[in-house]
From Swiss-Prot:
GO biological process, one term: response to oxidative stress
Annotated protein name in UniProt: Pyruvate synthase subunit PorA
This protein's encoding gene: porA
InterPro entries in UniProt: PFOR_II, Pyruvate:ferred/Flavod_OxRd, Pyruvate_synthase_PorA, Pyrv_Fd/Flavodoxin_OxRdtase_N, THDP-binding, Transketo_C/PFOR_II
MF terms in GO: pyruvate synthase activity
Assembly and interaction partners: Heterotetramer of one alpha, one beta, one delta and one gamma chain.
Amino acid sequence: MPIRTVMKANEAAAWAAKLAKPKVIAAFPITPSTLVPEKISEFVANGELDAEFIKVESEHSAISAVVGASAAGVRTFTATASQGLALMHEVLFIAAGMRLPIVMAIGNRSLSAPINIWNDWQDSISQRDTGWIQFYAENNQEALDLILLAYKVAEDERVLLPAMVGFDAFILTHTVEPVEIPDQEVVDEFLGEYEPKHAYLDPKRPITQGTLAFPAHYMEAKYLVWDAMEKARKVIDEAFAEFEKRFGRKYQKIEEYKTDDAEIIFVTMGSLAGTLKDWVDKKREEGYKVGAAKMTVYRPFPVEEIRALAKKAKVLGFIEKDISIGLYGAVFIDASAALVNESERPLMLDFIAGLGGRDVTFGQLDDALRIAEEALEKGEVEKPIHWIGLRKELL
């Protein structure tokens, strides 16, 4: 029977890893995700998880260790955040290029400088081009569920790509919420044994992995990574459908909330989706035709789902805790690319909010709504990007 309890998202991630039964875990502690490997090391030490826990001297070594273990043919897991993920950057490309279905938990935290240990999405958003599938959790239950789903998708032979699951620093990592721990037997049936055919250590079947590719072959290798990410779209939908049947919880790449008659729809990710939905309820009571959408899958980018959502809106706004310096927020950039060839598309606005753990308030969302209403009234967007909640007296 499932166990209903309360726990932090870090603990939920550790429980998900335990349920998935990885054989090798390597990690280096970093705020705010330190509790994830700590809890897993307890499971291993207590004999609750039959796995090798490798203590390393850096995050670069942690990801390198799980790359080696995955290349040897076993299920692996790691966790990190912020500068730790940035330090892993070099090896993330290697994991994807070698087609290793590693799963990693990310306690989404801002990047230095200045040093900041609080939440935004800059760390994982900055890895969007590495070839890793990316999921984002709204709450602690989703942190657990999405890690299980990450294994299901990553290990599918049509995909064979690594995956990361992000959940907001402190807002989720250190906050206790109700969580249902699934039954181990059901998880075993859902995931099955990891039996790779492409990468495993066998003296009778010697292979070379991570080898040099000349110009005559390199481009095709990269194409196959891109193609696998494209195939992951269907696999994710299939995994979501099976997960709902087995566990009773429904997931979608983009989850819509009160969008059917909305003129203005705001899109976000992570725990901010909860705030946004509560704010939409308040605005609906005040008579505003506003809706919300939560993006659970960021890579592969949900192109068709964004196009379907855009057809419902007159104004599509993105509330995001990241910034691509030199242009706009990354989610807005990707959504704009997804809609570029559409004959009809809504007015689009980007709102940068909550960087470095700053609270995103109803007042800030009211500011975003005011800007969206002005664009709707004028029928054009004069300025696509707006920083909301900015303390102008400090500039």
